[in-house]
Amino acid sequence: AQDSRQAWQLYENGEIDYAACAKHINWLIESGVHGLLPLGATGEFSALTLEERKAFAEFAMKEVAGRVPVIIGAVSTNVDVTLEVAKHAASIGADGVMILPPPGLHPSQDEIYAFYKHISENVTLPVMIYNNPGSSGVNILPETLDKIADLPHMGFLKESTGDIMRLTRAVDELADRLVIFCGCESLAYESFVMGAKAWVCVLANVAPAQS
């Protein structure tokens, strides 16, 4: 299965061009993507206010209209913002939320576990654990992922270290608890060979049928 990390369009004044975004969403779905992930890093969530993020999530859910699953990006340096986005995503019928360790704060492994534990106690949707050292500044180690996978509401792992051995280990050790997603463009084929179930794909924004 292939999910598209959805990019979005802006007017020159910085406002979201919802008409262009609607056209893009429909094109992606008609081209065969199996899911959408709005408000991820590719979607430049950090350029939006909390209210703009909520408004875009509502727009995306309405435009998709149940045709494919939607996982909403809920990344923030502020855990309260992450939880607010996650709770809002649940209220509008999203299928899950993607959550990265707070970027730029360089938490320890114990702090990462405590973060996801707090998340698990305050969400109702399935959580996509996002392991991307390039974005967060920290690598969630296999031992920590093993503990996180046992928490309530943990449903998916997006593995974006760029290390096929890490993804292979995740499949071997976590696939009975989490759905493993490849999060690296250059390793999609290898990831499927090694047992990943899906690919969160940036390239699909411009070439969905070929991705």
Residue ranges of model-derived segments:
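Active-site beta->alpha loop and helix N-cap motifs at the rims of alpha/beta catalytic domains
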Residues: S4, Q9-G137
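Catalytic alpha/beta core domains of metabolic enzymes, predominantly
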Residues: E121-N122, P133-S211
